[in-house]
Amino acid sequence: QGDGQTLTVSGQTNARYYQSYSISFFDPWFGGKRPNSFSVSAFYSRQTDISSRYYNDSYYNNYYNSIYSGYGGYGMYNYGNYNNYENYYDPDKSIQMWGLSIGWGKRLKWPDDYFTLSAELAYQRYILKDWQYFPVTDGKCNNISLNLTLARSSIDNPLFPRQGSEFSLSAQITPPYSLFDGRDYKGYYNSNGSITQDNRNKLYNWIEYHKWKFKAKTYTALMDYTTHPKSLVLMSRVEFGLLGHYNKYKKSPFETFDVGGDGMTGYSSYATESIALRGYENSSLTPYGSEGYAYTRLGIELRYPLMLETSTNIYVLGFLEAGNAWNDINKFNPFDLKRSAGVGVRIFLPMIGMMGIDWAYGFDKVFGSSSAGGSHFHFVLGDRKSVV
């Protein structure tokens, strides 16, 4: 690292089932004269499944253990243990992803010096083999997109803001292949509107969509923090996202919104954007059996600092928030929201980043459930800022 330039190399693995590697470079003063940023990154990941024999043998193992448990406890000694997870690794069921991106950003002088404009050109390739957890199960899918973002930030401190605001408006757009490739995508469907899995796999060889997002946060100290450093701070937020299509017969299952929980679904969110909403299970607010093509989230949070040092920040918080997701843009309703409330704590350490834990209670019923979201604990680790 020199002159603010950053090179990041990371790797993550879960034995043979999941591997992820990435490398990125960021220069905040590209050219050395003006605050123009430049970035380039690449990543690769692979996730595999287990054989269906695992579930069959698990049933077999549990069944016979229940029979013989009264005759010497065979199950206790793991005789014929069919549940050894490693033995069911199936390399023929997998999803691989790799991608490249290059970005550029510029600080604007109008309307004021707090505005920035950035652009990123990205390419991702998905290679799926008998992957049953997504609408596309086999094939190769390509995603080329241009992301434009207009943002403004006037906060006084990135770790514990006490005044100012942040907002961003972004558009992520792919080429409209269906408008010029000459294919009859309606013909991929049966007369009753259904579609075979083979046709579904062919439908998304080249992914197309346009994605729009708006996010805003404000920070207000409830006392003069220059004389009362430990003043309470009120943070308010509002955000929404829409995923549109050029052709109604080619709606993208990629880049959809996965709403609910702590926003830390990890490597399972390979083709979706995770949106946190505390007080509910992960992904529980996305309509069951479909994708989220629209979402909204809003909330207020009251923060109290326990320690504000150069290298360490600790604060506690209480919050009210609400949000929801819809499987069609036309169903978007900012007044149909799932509500929650809770408390939490945040600790920032230089070598780790932000850590925290929240307890939240969801007051409303979710899709496919007759009960309210209920009580949940949520964790914040590293640089993830989905719930902070």
Write out the residue ranges for each language-model feature.
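Short coil turns and loop connectors of transmembrane beta-barrels in diderm outer membranes
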Residues: 31-34, 110-113, 156, 222-224, ...
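Outer-membrane beta-barrel transmembrane domain signature
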Residues: 278, 323-340
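C-terminal outer-membrane beta-barrel translocator/porin domains of Gram-negative envelope proteins
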Residues: 1, 129-306, 318-319, 326-328, ...
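Strand-loop-strand
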Residues: 334-355
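Gram-negative/organellar outer-membrane beta-barrel architecture
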Residues: 1-160, 166, 278-279, 289, ...
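Short secondary-structure boundary/capping segments
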Residues: 55-59, 253-256, 333
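Generic long, charged, amphipathic alpha-helical segments
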Residues: 312-318
